[in-house]
Every structure is written in C-alpha cells, then in structure tokens.
C-alpha cells in the first residue's frame, strides 16, 4: 500500500529506541501514527519534529510523504500532486544544504536521492513520461552511489533489491539496464537485499517486510516465509487494515500449504 515509489525512495520506517540522531523518538512517533492510519497526527507530529530538529536526515522527506498520503485520502487527485510538488520544492533545497554540511554521513545523501526520485511521481501524475524517467533515473543514481560507497548501510539495500528482483522477471531491456549499473538482475539477489533491509534496516524495515510478504505470498508461492514478516507488521501497527489483511491471507495460505504437504 505505502510502497508508492518503490525503487525511488527509502520508505518510511521505525527508528531505534536509542536515538542515533536528535529527534529520532519524535520522528518515530510520527511514523508509527502514519502506519497506524492516523495521518492527521502523523503530519502534526512531523511538523513539530521539522521545527525542533531541522537537521534530522529523514524528517523532511517523511513529512512530505505523510502529507501526500493524507492528501490522497481527502483531496482530488490533481490537488494531491500539487501538494507533493510544493512540498518537494520546499525540502529539496534543505537536503542540498544538509548534504553539504554533513558530507560524511550517507543518510543525508540517501534521503536527498529519495526526495529527487519522488519528484518522478509528480511527473508520472502529469503523464510527463520522459521527465518521469529522467527524474527516476536521477534519484536512483544517487541512491545506488550510496549503496556502492556504503555497502553496510542496510537501508540502501531495499531500492537496489527491488530493481534486481523486478529486472530478473522482466524483459531483456530492463535486465540490460540493471547490468549497466553493475546490479545483479537476479531474484535471489534481490530477495537477499530486501531481506537485509527488513532485518537490519533502521529506516526501511516496514516497507521491506511488506514487500517481502507480497512477493512470497503472490509471486514466489512461499506463504510460510511471508507469515513472520506480516506478523511483525501487525504487532507493531495493529490499526493498519492492509497489514492485518495481508497477515490473514499469509496465515491462511500458509496453513493450506502445510495441510497439502502433509496430505491431510
């Protein structure tokens, strides 16, 4: 549901209980409200966090994404893109400045790439196809550079894993394009990278687990592997209807698989 930009962004996620960046706890509160479908509270909390902790690496991007999703629930489609476009125009100069100030910290570059990539969604909404491709490419290059330079940064593995997985099941042109960026167009490699993000990502574990749940349930036909991921999502976000529905589907399908394999 919330993987609205897939390749182009580092999705929203949980922050660890021990703050690494000042403001982690407040941003976490906003993120949890977001994934529990309390969008008004999420935007309110993230507004506050932006004011108090303007140098937090994720708060500006998460704020823009939360405002866009809230708009999708309450506003006409054209208005949602105007909101997203205006918010991105607001935060991109902020990220440009933060990357310069904290050039030693890859998280700022990662979120800058995410914000640049999200501009592709605005172009897509306007049916500007070439601009969509260009902006998506521009954002992905930034994210891919971070993943290459900082291979231990688990959060960067999600978008790379998505590209590798989907290029493996797509046409030759997409496979060639993935190889051009030194990516491995392989389902196994893609799943492994997404799993790293799900298990170790500070920011990306929520979307990573949701994506793995869908892939194992509907594409890989391995529902048993999906259950643990969806169970974790439901435990953390009990008010998220989509996660609850996904968990029920995973659990029921996994149970049916077990019965079938046992010849019961």
Predicted feature residues:
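Bacterial Sec-dependent N-terminal signal peptides
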Residues: 1-23
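Short coil/linker segments at helix-helix boundaries
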Residues: 19-26, 33-46, 63-154, 159-203, ...
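Solenoid-like repeat scaffolds
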Residues: 49-54, 149, 179-184, 198-202, ...
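Glycine- and aromatic-enriched membrane insertion/assembly motifs of diderm outer-membrane
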Residues: 52-58, 66-69
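Alpha-helix capping and inter-helical loop/turn segments
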Residues: 169, 217-221, 252-256
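Structural signature of tandem alpha-helical TPR/SEL1-like repeats
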Residues: 186-192, 221-228, 255-260
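Acidic, serine/threonine- and glycine-rich low-complexity intrinsically disordered segments
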Residues: 217-241
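A beta-strand-loop signature enriched in Asp, Gly, Thr, and Trp
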Residues: 241-264
């Amino acid at each position: 549901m919330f993987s609205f930009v897939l390749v182009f962004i580092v999705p929203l996620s949980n922050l660890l209980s021990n703050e690494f960046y000042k403001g982690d706890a407040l941003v976490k509160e906003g993120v949890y409200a977001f994934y529990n479908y309390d969008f008004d509270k999420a935007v309110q909390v993230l507004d506050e966090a932006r004011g108090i902790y303007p140098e937090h690496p994720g708060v500006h991007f998460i704020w823009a994404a939360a405002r866009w999703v809230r708009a999708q629930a309450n506003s006409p489609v054209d208005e949602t893109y105007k909101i997203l476009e205006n918010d991105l125009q607001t935060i991109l100069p902020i990220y440009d400045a933060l990357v310069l100030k904290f050039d030693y910290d890859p998280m700022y570059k990662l979120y800058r790439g995410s914000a640049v990539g999200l501009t592709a969604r605005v172009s897509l909404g306007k049916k500007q196809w070439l601009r969509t491709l260009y902006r998506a490419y521009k954002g992905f290059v930034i994210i891919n550079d971070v993943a290459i330079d900082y291979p231990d940064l688990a959060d960067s593995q999600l978008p790379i894993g998505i590209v590798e997985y989907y290029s493996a099941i797509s046409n030759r042109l997409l496979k060639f394009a993935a190889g051009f960026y030194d990516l491995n167009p392989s389902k196994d490699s893609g799943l492994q990278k997404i799993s790293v993000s799900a298990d170790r990502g500070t920011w990306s574990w929520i979307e990573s687990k949701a994506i793995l749940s869908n892939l194992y349930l509907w594409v890989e036909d391995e529902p048993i592997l999906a259950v643990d991921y969806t169970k974790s999502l439901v435990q953390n976000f009990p008010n998220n209807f989509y996660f609850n529905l996904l968990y029920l589907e995973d659990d029921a399908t996994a149970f049916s698989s077990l019965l079938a394999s046992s010849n019961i």
